[in-house]
C-alpha cells in the first residue's frame, strides 16, 4: 500500500510535490466513473492532509473551468475574495499562454469546492452532491465574467 511519503517528491525549492494525475486538479478533481463517490472523497482527504506548501502537479489544465464552477456555487464559507482573486490571476496567466499548474495544497483547501466538500467528514455525501453539480455543467449557463462581476 502506498503512503503519502511515497506519493510526494521534493521540488527544486524544497517544497514537496504531489504528482496526482487525474485525482486532484487545480480548483477541482477528476471524474468518478465507477465505484462509490466516498472512495474519491477519501482519496482527496488524504491529499488534503499534505503540507499546505505541497505543489499539486495534476495531469490537466482545467483550472479556469473549475474556478468558473466554484464561483457559480456561491458556497458559504468558500473564501469569495480568494476565489475571485485566483480566477483573475488564472485569466491573466492564460492570456499570456501560461499554465496555472502547479497549484498548492493550501490554495486548494481554500478555493477548491470539491476538495472542501470531501473534507466535510460525512462519508462523501457532500462531495457527491458537489461532484454531481459539476458534472451537470449547469454552471456554464452563466458566464465566468458575469460571476466575477456579481
Q: Model-flagged regions — what are they?
A:
Residues 1-74, 129:
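Catalytic core of the metallo-beta-lactamase
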